[in-house]
Amino acid sequence: MENGSYTSYFILLGLFNHTRAHQVLFMMVLSIVLTSLFGNSLMILLIHWDHRLHTPMYFLLSQLSLMDVMLVSTTVPKMAADYLTGSKAISRAGCGAQIFFLPTLGGGECFLLAAMAYDRYAAVCHPLRYPTLMSWQLCLRMNLSCWLLGAADGLLQAVATLSFPYCGAHEIDHFFCETPVLVRLACADTSVFENAMYICCVLMLLVPFSLILSSYGLILAAVLHMRSTEARKKAFATCSSHVAVVGLFYGAAIFTYMRPKSHRSTNHDKVVSAFYTMFTPLLNPLIYSVKNSEVKGALTRCMGRCVALSRE
């Protein structure tokens, strides 16, 4: 089962203890997570159900919601089960699965947000050429590329992280298996891997982020040249939701993966990880539904149809 360097399981110390205050926090977090799962699932169903939302923009938004549902499902069920049962062990395979899915979904979301920025650029700056610049074929290719690039990063991180010897070190002071936290337990020189991971994070975060900034710089210039006040308002309303989501996601991701090692602390890692795995997925459907009249219209039509069916 185990020798001096092989560890068949790990112990996740978790996010909460069993004090009264932490029990209340746990219930609040659980409520937020359930709301997040409901909101993102509803967004996916609305986009699939309402033909008015069958456009590249909303297809990409449905993929963002799918990634958020999977991201929450990767970490929270295990955390909740551990807290309620007191069993904190996670197998090596289970830990590897979490390490794989988190970069897959997080990295995929980086590229997906860049694809969504390009979609808004094409719609605002070149509305007449939009069907050509953002064809369904291109949209599907970009979406597939986002998933594949994220999966490649996740696979590399999972294989490399679990290849290190851990010399019987079991306890992970976190609520899920995350590469930067787990690598600290390794009883081998991980500097080459950490440097490679840092470079990879720079590429996966800053390259898409630069594309997003460039897209919105061009969008802003185009909006300022619009003569119609109504057109300006519509363009700002369409893009402001995406800008808010980008700010939340990239802020948390850059803080987590691009801080110098000397500035890292376990408590900060837990808080930031909780933010981008639990709270950001909740905010995405709220931001897009509140700011978007088409989504609100689809929700109203869906509720009306449900009421009509219930009366039959």
UniProtKB/Swiss-Prot annotation:
Keyword Cell wall biogenesis/degradation: no
Extracellular side: 1-26, 77-96, 165-201, 256-269
GO biological process: detection of chemical stimulus involved in sensory perception of smell
Keywords attached to this entry: Cell membrane, Disulfide bond, G-protein coupled receptor, Glycoprotein, Membrane, Olfaction, Receptor, Sensory transduction, Transducer, Transmembrane, Transmembrane helix
UniProt-annotated location(s): Cell membrane
Disulfide topology: C95-C177
Pfam families: 7tm_4 (PF13853)
Signal peptide span: none
Glycosylation sites: N3, N17
Protein known as: Olfactory receptor 2T8
